[in-house]
Every structure is written in structure tokens, then in C-alpha cells.
A protein has these predicted regions:
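Conserved N-terminal beta1-alpha1 strand-loop-helix module at the mouth
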Residues: 1-154, 158-203
């Protein structure tokens, strides 16, 4: 599957998803370690999944945990990248000891705030993940500019029908694909994900 933008599959909660990611050449697998999230995965389960798969970079997605807790868990699991959605100050991030992706919620941030946030964290982060349920056409200019200046993972609204257009218009560094839940252990359908991948790779 060929596309200039990389792909991230998240949240990984089972071995089936991890194997799918590896088989399809997906660059990043996200594991949710935010205890307040419905997608929270026990670290011991994540460790089992990570040990059985290879080929994709592992991304630990954290919530409001303390910096030291994040650093210790990311080291214990040998995570490749840490994704943060909390308010840890930029100059504290090197203490984590891993490449950092800063998650930004556009639902609560206007264009000026977004520009300031990107500028403040850029020296300490390898990239940013933009989250939210915004109407992207209303913020097209700032999103194009952000994707041009920074490594942006697109976790904003898209559908199979328009994903190719989004990649062409905004040119994000990567796009986040949503991993669903297993119907039962070891059994899962991937029709929707395959449809998105086919749309991305279509001429």
C-alpha cells in the first residue's frame, strides 16, 4: 500500500490488531495507558502484545499521569514513542527519555492558541497529534500551515470517501486509524480498515 503519509493504528487492545498493523505495513501502533479512558490497556497485556509483534513503532498514549510514572512505564515496556495529552511543561519532556508526540485537542483551541502551542512544544517534540471533532473546512488554512511546518498526525474527522482528498489537501505526516474491539477473543473483522487502506492507495 503506497502513500506519502504514514499510518498509525490506535488504540491497540489485542494481538489481532497488532498483527494486522504489522502485516499492512502500518508505521505506528498506539497503546492507551490512560486509566481514565475506556481504551485503557493493562501494561502487562501490552507487553505480551508487543513481544509477539514487530515491524511497527510502539506508541504509549498517556493521560494525566505523573511524569515519573510515564518515564518508568515507557522504559519498562521499551516503548519507541510517548504520546502525551496532559499539561507537562515543554522543558520537562526530556526527562521522559523517549521521543515525544504532543496531542492537541482542537475542540478547545482556536487558531492563535494552536500556533502558540505548536511553537512552544516544537523544540521538545518529534511531532503532534491533532485530535477533535471540528469542522475541518472552517480551519483549512491553519491546518494546512500546521501540516507544512510540523510532523502532524491527523486524528480529525475523515471517512473512507474523503480520506484521499484530506491527504492530498493537508499532507499530514501521518493519519490515525481507529482500531475497533474484538467480537470475541481472536476474532475480528477488518473490512472498514481495509476499505480505508484501499481508498488511500487508490490512484
Amino acid at each position: 500500500m503506497a502513500t506519502s503519509s504514514k499510518l498509525k493504528l490506535s488504540p491497540i487492545t489485542n494481538l489481532s490488531d497488532a498483527r494486522f498493523a504489522a502485516a499492512e505495513g502500518i508505521a505506528y501502533m498506539g497503546f492507551c495507558f490512560d486509566p481514565s479512558s475506556a481504551d485503557f490497556l493493562l501494561p502487562i497485556k501490552a507487553k505480551e502484545i508487543i513481544e509477539w509483534t514487530s515491524g511497527s513503532h510502539t506508541v504509549g498514549e498517556f493521560g494525566d499521569q505523573e511524569l515519573q510514572d510515564i518515564a518508568e512505564l515507557s522504559e519498562l515496556l521499551n516503548l519507541d514513542i510517548v504520546l502525551l495529552s496532559n499539561a507537562i511543561l515543554p522543558d520537562e519532556l526530556p526527562q521522559i527519555g523517549k521521543p515525544i508526540i504532543k496531542a492537541i485537542n482542537l475542540n478547545v483551541m482556536d487558531s492563535v492558541q494552536l500556533a502558540n502551542e505548536l511553537c512552544a512544544y516544537a523544540p521538545y517534540c518529534d511531532g503532534f497529534q491533532l485530535n477533535g471533532t471540528i469542522e475541518i473546512s472552517e480551519r483549512e488554512g491553519e491546518l494546512i500551515e500546521a501540516c507544512a511546518q510540523y510532523k502532524i498526525i491527523w486524528n480529525l474527522p475523515f471517512a473512507t470517501e474523503n480520506v484521499k482528498q484530506i491527504l492530498h489537501t493537508y499532507k499530514p505526516y501521518a493519519i490515525n486509524l481507529l482500531a475497533g474491539s474484538e467480537e470475541k477473543t481472536g476474532m475480528k473483522e477488518y473490512d472498514e480498515l481495509y476499505a480505508v487502506l484501499d481508498a488511500i492507495s487508490a490512484n
